[in-house]
Amino acid sequence: MSLVGAIEAGGTKFILAIANRDGTILERARLDTRHPDETLCEAATWFEGAASRHGALSAFGIASFGPIDIDPGSPTYGTFTTTPKPGWSGARFHDALARFDVPLAIDTDVNGAALGEYLAGAGQGARTIAYTTVGTGIGTGVVTDGAPVSGISHFESGHLRPARPHGDDWPGNCPYHGDCLEGLASGPAILARWGHDLSAAPEEQISLVADYLGELACALVLLHMPGRMIFGGGVMKAPGLLEALRRTTRARLGGYIAAWDRDLSEMIVAPALGDDAGITGAIALGRSCIREASVAEGP
């Protein structure tokens, strides 16, 4: 029986799971994210125990925070790069999991969530989806025909600079770009600007954040032509924000894209898998490793 080890590596917690080849989770655990020497060692030890209970692992699938090298052809594949998470720059998943001697498939946390929603959630039935999380940071994963899309690295949609209304001169709080999307519409930016989150915010604040995110939604439509866009994360739970985003996206597109010039209640949606999107995607990454190994071995 081919078993998959899966990791959803977040900035505050790690979700670990061992699953059948069909994706059924046999056991799972949660770890706090600390220094990589502690966290990765603890994760590897948990997988050793889980494997002793369920059987040997055939592959790992990992959906991780970053920035992280996700190019399988790179000598630094699976290595954290310029992450602001203290101690994590230079840490490698391969080092911690070398004892298992199995292949690893590594992608970003948002790509993992996008893949999970594509396969088993709100993205089902669409050829291309774009999944955006708006929380501590802002990031987007795109999946086409069942595979995450990337270039030399993962997308950084949160660092696009939106057009801003006249008189909106708050400088933003991104340490790199100031008033990029992440510096204006992430959870920390909203708190820094107004001193509260959007859970009970006045309509004008909801509308302004929707305007910022509408810039991103329009860019995703124009660049990727998704059949569906999913917006998740803590900020998107604010009452009325998703509806405002639909309105501003349609208005900003100006009728130019026929498929998006209509009511967008089925085109811009909330996630369906909740907190399980990331681990579902990580399992799928691991399953792809097993399939590729089977093809390479031949009949």
Feature map (PLM): residue ranges:
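ATP-binding/phosphotransfer module of carbohydrate and carboxylate kinases, centering on a glycine-rich
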Residues: 1-59, 68-76, 94, 98-103, ...
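Conserved G/P- and acidic residue-centered "switch" motifs that form tight phosphate/ATP-binding loops
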Residues: 8, 109, 135
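Conserved A3 ("GATE") glycine/threonine-rich loop of ANL adenylate-forming enzymes
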Residues: 13, 112, 136-138
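Conserved NAD(P)H cofactor-binding loop of Rossmann-fold oxidoreductase domains
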Residues: 65
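A charged helix-plus-loop insertion that forms the helical arch/lid used to bind
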Residues: 74-89
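General beta-strand structural signal in soluble alpha/beta enzymes
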Residues: 104-112
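Glycine-rich phosphate-binding loop of actin/hexokinase-like ATP-binding domains
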Residues: 126-182
